Amino acid sequence: MAVESRVTQEEIKKEPEKPIDREKTCPLLLRVFTTNNGRHHRMDEFSRGNVPSSELQIYTWMDATLKELTSLVKEVYPEARKKGTHFNFAIVFMDLKRPGYRVKEIGSTMSGRKGTDDSMTLQSQKFQIGDYLDIAITPPNRAPPSSGRMRPY
């Protein structure tokens, strides 16, 4: 049943994104987990009903952009407001084929600079209600890891 539902939603997403009327559409609860070491959480931290302790709960909509989410995180973590702070976003989702979670990096933003991923939305990255968002925050005085995609998951 869940597989059928996911296929139907993927077919719907092939159409151009329709703007969401935030006055009439109920927001979703986005569970966000952050690190300040530039690396995403390990997938085993999400196992057996457990989640990392660094959780933010944000009410938002599927058309929320990475830049908008960056601003909300900076409200909670003043040290992340420094110009040059790097935010790397990943969706953490339940793997339907085998037990456990998987991660999909979706983009990055930087405090004080415009970037190509700023206008990327949750909806455009196939975020599903119930997925988590993991944000690896790198302070400006440290370079972000060369590529988190090289890490085996």
From Swiss-Prot:
Descriptive protein name: Histone deacetylase complex subunit SAP18
Plastid found in the keyword field: no
Family listed: Belongs to the SAP18 family.
Crosslink feature (Glycyl lysine isopeptide (Lys-Gly) (interchain with G-Cter in SUMO2)) location: K13
Transmembrane segments: none
UniProt xrefs under InterPro entries: Hist_deAcase_cplx_SAP18, SAP18, SAP18_sf
Subunit organization: Found in a mRNA splicing-dependent exon junction complex (EJC). Component of the heterotrimeric ASAP (apoptosis- and splicing-associated protein) and PSAP complexes consisting of RNPS1, SAP18 and either ACIN1 or PNN, respectively; the ASAP and PSAP complexes probably are formed mutually exclusive. For the ASAP complex, the association of SAP18 seems to require a preformed RNPS1:ACIN1 complex. Forms a complex with SIN3A and HDAC1. Interacts with SUFU.
One GO term of the biological process aspect: negative regulation of mRNA splicing, via spliceosome
Regions of compositional bias (Basic and acidic residues) in chain numbering: 7-20
Purpose: Component of the SIN3-repressing complex. Enhances the ability of SIN3-HDAC1-mediated transcriptional repression. When tethered to the promoter, it can direct the formation of a repressive complex to core histone proteins. Auxiliary component of the splicing-dependent multiprotein exon junction complex (EJC) deposited at splice junction on mRNAs. The EJC is a dynamic structure consisting of core proteins and several peripheral nuclear and cytoplasmic associated factors that join the complex only transiently either during EJC assembly or during subsequent mRNA metabolism.
Keywords attached to this entry: Acetylation, Cytoplasm, Isopeptide bond, mRNA processing, mRNA splicing, Nucleus, Repressor, Transcription, Transcription regulation, Ubl conjugation
A single cellular component GO annotation: nucleoplasm
Entry comment describing in which tissues the protein is expressed: Expressed in all tissues tested; highest levels in the brain, kidney and muscle; lowest levels in lung spleen, liver, intestine and testis, and moderate levels in salivary gland and heart.
Pfam families: SAP18
List of residues that carry N-acetylalanine: A2
GO molecular function: transcription corepressor activity
Cell compartments where the protein resides: Nucleus; Cytoplasm; Nucleus speckle
Record region (Disordered): 1-20
Keyword Heme listed: no
Name of the encoding gene: Sap18
Segments of this protein annotated with the region Involved in splicing regulation activity: 93-153
